[in-house]
Amino acid sequence: MEAPRGNLRAVALIAGDNNVRGCLQFVQDISGTTHVTGKISGLSPGFHGFHIHSFGDTTNGCISTGPHFNPLNRVHGPPNEEERHAGDLGNILAGSNGVAEILIKDKHIPLSGQYSILGRAVVVHADPDDLGKGGHKLSKSTGNAGSRVGCGIIGLQSSADAKL
């Protein structure tokens, strides 16, 4: 999986419960869209909520990453709609081998500017994200995606280190 060429690059090393591990690369292209690529292993097969959370703090595991990144104070929603948290990236799918291959393009998670995601955390949840449409009391805030099974801090990457 080759990420597009761009000026800004970031990386997140994912760690968590039950040997959940991964490496994600973030590349902001010249149009401002951020491309997220990589793999996460150790997941249960099926869909898992996938979000950018507000804080790059893992001192208390993934719980200390705070809520979804939401600088515009919107309700939770699917990644293809404007009414959503900036950090709402929907779901990733882990195959029967427990590996999810990530290939996401999103204009709401820039690596620069006022709403940059640098220094924040990416989080994988135990359950599917209902995209704000599940009718559960947590649907409009978390997508009712369950516990946090893995996370990593999004850090600026040197262009010399871009080949992971």
Swiss-Prot record:
Please give the catalytic activity noted in the UniProt record: 2 superoxide + 2 H(+) = H2O2 + O2
Which GO CC annotations does the UniProt entry carry?
A: peroxisome; plant-type vacuole
Q: Which cofactor does it need?
A: Cu cation; Zn(2+)
Subcellular location as annotated: Peroxisome
Q: Which CDD domains match?
A: Cu-Zn_Superoxide_Dismutase
Under what conditions is it induced?
A: Upon photosynthetically active radiation (PAR) (e.g. light fluence) increase or after high-light pulse, and UV-B treatment. Accumulates in response to ozone fumigation, during recovery. Repressed by salt stress.
Q: Which UniProt keywords apply?
A: Antioxidant, Copper, Disulfide bond, Metal-binding, Oxidoreductase, Peroxisome, Zinc
> Gene3D superfamilies of this UniProt entry?
Superoxide dismutase, copper/zinc binding domain
Q: Where is this motif: Peroxisome localization signal?
A: 162-164
Q: Does the keyword Oxidoreductase apply?
A: yes
Bound how, and how many: what does the cofactor note say? Binds 1 copper ion per subunit. Binds 1 zinc ion per subunit.
Q: In which tissues is it expressed?
A: Expressed in leaves (at protein level).
Iron: present as a keyword of the record? no
Q: Where does Zn(2+) bind?
A: H68, H76, H85, D88
Q: Which Pfam families match?
A: Sod_Cu (PF00080)
Which GO molecular-function terms appear in the entry? Answer: copper ion binding; superoxide dismutase activity
E.C. designation(s) = 1.15.1.1
Role according to the record: Destroys radicals which are normally produced within the cells and which are toxic to biological systems.
Q: How does it assemble?
A: Homodimer.
PANTHER family the record matches: SUPEROXIDE DISMUTASE CU-ZN -RELATED (PTHR10003)
Task: Indicate the family of this protein.
Answer: Belongs to the Cu-Zn superoxide dismutase family.
Provide the protein name.
Superoxide dismutase [Cu-Zn] 3
What species was this sequence derived from? Arabidopsis thaliana (Mouse-ear cress)
Highest classification ranks of the organism: Eukaryota, Viridiplantae, Streptophyta, Embryophyta, Tracheophyta
Could you tell me the gene encoding this protein? CSD3
